[in-house]
Amino acid sequence: MTSEEIHAAGLCSVVPTIFQNCDNDWISKNGTCYQDSCCMSLETATSWYYRLAQFSHVVFSFMGLIIVVVYILRYRSRHILPENVRVLVDFMLLFIVAHSIDMIVLHIYHIIQSFQANISDPCFVREKVSFCAPFRYTFSFCSMGLAICTYCIYIDRLACAYYKNYTKHQRLILAAQICQLIVISSLIIIWVYRNEEPNTYLLSCLNVPVASVEDMAKATIAVFPINFICFFLSIGLFRHFKKKEEGSRFDIVRHFTASVDVESSEFLFRTTGTQAALMALFSVASLLMRLVYNFLPRQVGLTIATLSYIMSIYCFTVPLVIVKCVQKTSALRKSRISSHVGLKAMGVEGASNYFEMMKSQWE
């Protein structure tokens, strides 16, 4: 059979360029090309660049965990957000933590497996789809959950901006958003993996099973543009709440609420902008990967495919942006307090005492 005939017969996922036999391959069916054999999986898994790509997920995920812990312990109490937004941001952080732990455990396991593998059993580096299910469902649910959570935050902000009885029904709106977040994310993941074949094998649990690739692409196309829509919404909401703040100068309660809404809108603008940029990068990387994959050596293609999953970078970058936003708003708030005290307090000693009392509430 020619290379094209082998590819057309379904014995190779690409037009084969290497014509060798893979001994001790007890997984692949007879006639499978070398590129799809366990021998190629072994060569890929034991290559330094593939291990480095896997380790990059461990590094970014670990740094993301550290930043989330720092935010919770040091900055969360200073981060003034509307109640519903705070709860949904906590869900975002929960998804980031779960995703990061999943990536760390998953890739450390595969790296250890690669060092234990040998040519006498090249299929040792592969894992069953059923074995990978807990890892796959976890990171897929968290990825979808992060996108849907952003959507829920903006529904809440739109309700706050334009629904007159928002304050009265605030908790009901929050409960509806949480239910929507969990149900939609779960249904998407169940639908995507409904046709997976549990007895087939994968080189990495990060890989999507062949039977689910098209459905995952459809789900990604449908869900991730949410970040771009929300980015433009954040601009409109910031302007809306800024006008509301300027119109409430003589009502302390309304002015404080409006100021919190303005700060939260600026915070959402920065985080959503980061998310949109990362999702754009992810889309471009995935598209380029599909275009050039068949023209690359299999080890290089699989390495680039591993790197193109940028959610580990997402789980590092977004918490970092959140912390930077809190630092900026805290510094600005302290500056305003200092200016206010300088104008209102009587006498040097009185100003100093009053400033220290005001300052202590932010430390």
UniProtKB/Swiss-Prot annotation:
Any idea which GO molecular function terms this record carries?
G protein-coupled receptor activity; olfactory receptor activity
The record's Pfam families line, in alphabetical order, gives:
7TM_GPCR_Sra
One GO term of the cellular component aspect?
Answer: membrane
Subcellular location, in the record's words? Membrane
Q: Name one GO biological process term.
A: detection of chemical stimulus involved in sensory perception
| InterPro entries on file | 7TM_GPCR_serpentine_rcpt_Sra, Nematode_rcpt-like_serp_alpha
State the UniProt keywords alphabetically.
Membrane, Transmembrane, Transmembrane helix
Record flagged with keyword Transmembrane:
yes
- Chain segments annotated as transmembrane: 52-72, 92-112, 135-155, 172-192, 218-238, 276-296, 303-323
Q: How does it sit in the membrane?
A: Multi-pass membrane protein
Q: Which family does it belong to?
A: Belongs to the nematode receptor-like protein srb family.
Q: What is this protein called?
A: Serpentine receptor class beta-18
Q: Which organism is it from?
A: Caenorhabditis elegans
